[in-house]
Amino acid sequence: MSNVDHAEIAKFEALAHRWWDRESEFKPLHEINPLRVNWIEEHVRLAGKKVLDVGCGGGILSEAMALRGAAVTAIDMGEAPLAVARLHQLESGVEVDYRQSTVEALAAEMPGRFDVVTCLEMLEHVPDPASVIHACHTLVKPGGQVFFSTINRNPKAYLLAIIGAEYLLKLLPRGTHDFRKFIRPSELGAWCRASGLAIGDIVGLTYNPLTRHYKLGTDVDVNYMIQTWREE
């Protein structure tokens, strides 16, 4: 059975043409992207590395890592987001190898091929997150690093990530997230360890509605990122 939620794919296909509009529904992704890339580079210098971006969408993170000197392969199952990513690539001149593939299929084709794997804002949109994590472990070289981000599952996350972000502040379209698919850090950590990934750093991402700024910190109650590596 394919680890793809076709309703999730359709949701992002419908919005794909606005992916690179910094005032669109994707404004939060544009605003947090520098924080994400800088945090990744605190752990691994991207220049000269072979990097895989899983669930790349329109390529916001993919292009940013390529601009840091990485050789980036980026995969997604949405045709429209990939078309937007390739079009923007023509305009920006940033080289990224975009492919339509599941991470599981690519893992069978290219095991141990990448120095770094990123899987950000993707796990909460698939039926079987553990399968994605296992495939990421397969794709990264021994000693290589894998980065994940997702949303915690608790009442605070429901209030802020869904009621606040989607209904009150309207930072995201209604229906972007399903609370039942949110993932506690303990669950993500258990899946990583079961796949052979060692847990490193974990950092929270918070939004201040008064200043309209995002920042990284120790609060992992809602959005968080985790650094792991494949043990040699």
From Swiss-Prot:
One of its GO terms (molecular function) is 2-polyprenyl-6-hydroxyphenol methylase activity. SUPFAM superfamilies: S-adenosyl-L-methionine-dependent methyltransferases. S-adenosyl-L-methionine binds at R36, G55, D76, L120. Its EC number is 2.1.1.222, 2.1.1.64. Keywords: Methyltransferase, S-adenosyl-L-methionine, Transferase, Ubiquinone biosynthesis. It comes from the Bacteria. Pathway: Cofactor biosynthesis; ubiquinone biosynthesis. It is an enzyme of class 2 (transferase). GO terms for biological process: methylation. The keyword Methyltransferase applies. The keyword S-adenosyl-L-methionine applies. It catalyses: a 3-demethylubiquinol + S-adenosyl-L-methionine = a ubiquinol + S-adenosyl-L-homocysteine + H(+); a 3-(all-trans-polyprenyl)benzene-1,2-diol + S-adenosyl-L-methionine = a 2-methoxy-6-(all-trans-polyprenyl)phenol + S-adenosyl-L-homocysteine + H(+). O-methyltransferase that catalyzes the 2 O-methylation steps in the ubiquinone biosynthetic pathway. NCBIfam families: UbiG. Belongs to the methyltransferase superfamily. UbiG/COQ3 family. This is Ubiquinone biosynthesis O-methyltransferase. It comes from Azotobacter vinelandii (strain DJ / ATCC BAA-1303). The lineage of its organism: Bacteria, Pseudomonadati, Pseudomonadota, Gammaproteobacteria, Pseudomonadales.
